A protein has these predicted regions:
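Soluble, non-membrane globular domain cores that form compact, hydrophobic packing
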Residues: 2-104, 110-197
Length: 197
């Protein structure tokens, strides 16, 4: 074999090796763990909420689960913290029938191809933990599994328990976003021991 043929063969082998490495990196390195969740409708999200509660061993308040009207952007924002819902297919929320309890579990299904982790982060950053006015949610968790996002906010113990139930059912989740809220400080004239006029 002459020198030119040997060089061509070496170049071809090098190119094949580089292509094989790139295929390996993209095929296996970027693969996310598969979600156990298959959601094709708002009813599927409602059923998932029921399954989440089945895995919760602590006492829960009396709750009402509802599918949100996707044309009512203000209501969707109230429950999700999302200003833009163009990439959202369904939203189902579960909250107490008596609104003096700071508790909310919201499941969101985003459209195929949407970065659900980014939406989960936006929800965690923008959800109003004081939306009930007289009470505040102490802890907020959000995470995506496939194209389903879970947001739960309430006291720390309940939030952890409900969120763990979601993660167990999902099988795998992306980035977990967590936020802790402090109780607002009362004005001095409202502190205990102050005279009220």
């Amino acid at each position: 074999m002459n020198k030119t043929v040997k060089i061509i063969i070496a170049v071809v082998i090098a190119i094949v090796a580089v292509v094989a490495i790139l295929v390996g990196v993209f095929a296996f390195g970027n693969s996310k763990p598969k979600s156990n969740l298959t959601i094709n409708s708002a009813e599927d999200l409602t059923a998932l909420i029921d399954q989440i509660y089945s895995g919760v061993s602590i006492e829960m308040p009396m709750l009402m689960t509802q599918e949100l009207d996707m044309t009512d952007t203000e209501t969707v924002k109230y429950f999700t913290g999302l200003e833009n819902i163009d990439n959202v297919e369904y939203v189902v929320a579960s909250e107490p029938m008596m609104t003096s309890q700071a508790y909310s579990l919201v499941l969101v299904k985003v459209k195929d191809g949407v970065n659900a982790d980014a939406v989960a982060k936006t929800m965690n950053e923008n959800i109003n933990t004081r939306k009930w006015i007289c009470v505040t949610a102490e802890k907020v968790y959000t995470a995506a599994s496939g194209n389903v996002i879970c947001l739960v906010m309430t006291n720390t113990e309940t939030a952890q328990t409900v969120f763990e139930s979601f993660k167990t059912l999902a099988g795998s989740v992306g980035e977990v976003y967590e936020r802790t809220e402090e109780e607002p400080e009362l004005p001095e004239d409202m502190l205990p021991g102050q005279e009220v006029y």
